[in-house]
UniProtKB/Swiss-Prot annotation:
GO terms for biological process: cell wall organization; peptidoglycan biosynthetic process; regulation of cell shape. GO terms for molecular function: ATP binding; D-alanine-D-alanine ligase activity; metal ion binding. Its EC number is 6.3.2.4. Keywords: ATP-binding, Cell shape, Cell wall biogenesis/degradation, Cytoplasm, Ligase, Magnesium, Manganese, Metal-binding, Nucleotide-binding, Peptidoglycan synthesis. InterPro entries: ATP-grasp (IPR011761), ATP_grasp_subdomain_1 (IPR013815), D-Ala_lig_Van_CS (IPR000291), D_ala_D_ala (IPR005905), Dala_Dala_lig_C (IPR011095), Dala_Dala_lig_N (IPR011127), PreATP-grasp_dom_sf (IPR016185). It comes from the Bacteria. The keyword Amino-acid biosynthesis does not apply. This is D-alanine--D-alanine ligase. Binds 2 magnesium or manganese ions per subunit.
Amino acid sequence: MTDKIKVGLIFGGNSSEYEVSIMSAHNIYEEIDTNKFDVYPMWITNDGYLANDADSRKVLDNPKMEVANPHKVANISNIVELKDRPEIDVFFPIVHGNLGEDGCLQGLFRVLDKPFVGDDVLAAAVTMDKEMTKILAQRAGVPVAKWIAVKRFEYNDPDNNKLDYEYVASQLGSDLFVKPSNQGSSVGVSHVTNEKEYKVALAEAFKYDDKVLVEETVHGTEVETAVLGNDKPIVAGVGQIINAKDSFYTYENKYDDNSTSTLEIPAKLPEGIVEKVRKNALKVFQATECSGLARIDSMLRTEDKEVVLTEVNALPGFTNISMYPKLFEEVGIPYTDLITKLIDYAMERYDHKKTLLHKHD
């Protein structure tokens, strides 16, 4: 009898998307194929504490519970909470946002010489930064919304013209979105149409990041697709997000029970548009050197039916309402099989990396 693969399921973290991470981890924990895998949950609290095995399992059933006798992850001598886990064969990180999907955690796995689900270090860092994603997408021939990046030193300079709404509006139009460059789940995002709103939006976005993007508003419908694989990735169908009039897909609309947004899977769109969304997604996935998985978000612009890239989510949610697993379920890959494939792709990439030379003989 073959031994089961030991999976380290890492979730939580010091992130604005902490609750989403716990919901995702709960679903993975419940749906993973227990005939193939033994799961060892590793909970990092929102304060950055590492929980033991027993508490990590409890929080998956009760997300509001607080860890007993916590140990700060930052203090290496206190990572004793890992002693009650066996040697892990593969890590499945589902830590959203900063430190979880920006290359930091992925770098740790590389140092530990362990396979892990999702992007490698470079792709994780690139796709977390919305501006870098835009630059690479443009080079790949994928349309993106016009933007201006405002960095912290510019924000601290009262004479910088990027702080002047009239100047920015002359470049991008008067209808704008302001967002942190390195955040997800619409955290810190504001829609602005005047000077007062612009100043408030900048202040809000700079709470979350040291670089903020100001983008033209692309009027249309939000469309998403999902990509799975390494060198020969497959692209799922397309889903559409139907928002209430004058609203957009906010954090609350994504996860609140009273959401005013609905998901349409598959999207009721002409086949030509569906294929364009899928082709653009593949281009972006490859241009950013993603591997394993990614959800590619775009806007279908009303005026000309152009598909305009919004962002790449290289560690998408796995909650009950998350688009990524739903899109693959719609094309015949159920949740449990999807988890298995993601772990298989992680092992495949790791095995390939081991064949590369790292020193000159």
